[in-house]
Amino acid sequence: ERLMAEGARHYGTLRGRALQWLERVEIDAGRIDDKPALYSGGMQQRLQIARNLVTSPRLVFMDEPTGGLDVSVQARLLDLLRHLVLDMDLAVILVTHDLAVARLLSHRLMVMYRGEVVETGLTDQVLDDPHHAYTQLLVSSILQG
């Protein structure tokens, strides 16, 4: 749908782009005609990533992109996301409660508490030397957990 919204109408072109993106997100091209409901959770996430990136946006919003996935699936998906972000030079706004995901995917971090921004800065600086009490609690609870 997204390619058609941008004016693509030729079936061969649409299918070709879809095949390219299935390959980029590591889904077997032979499954191009499968309904999304037939995919596993991790494959559905990768399919959604392809759907959102097919039009080459400059900015992407991700809300808990690895939520609900097994740890092994999360690792593969995070690796894929990291490579796509670098390859496409994407700006990403990422919402996550997982500090490992934040550390892996972000350059800058904003910590919110009760709807207010309490700390911002380079990811490593904020996580390695938190100044706000909530950020300190957040980081220490992850280290102890």
Give short role names for the model-derived ranges.
Residues K35-Y39, M43:
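Conserved ABC ATPase signature
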Residues E26, L127-G145:
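C-terminal boundary and immediately downstream tail of ABC-type ATPase nucleotide-binding domains
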Residues A75-M88, A100:
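Helical segment within the ABC ATPase nucleotide-binding domain
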Residues T13-G30, V139-S140:
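Conserved ABC ATPase "signature" region
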Residues A102-L104:
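A short, surface-exposed alpha-helical micro-motif characterized by mixed small hydrophobic
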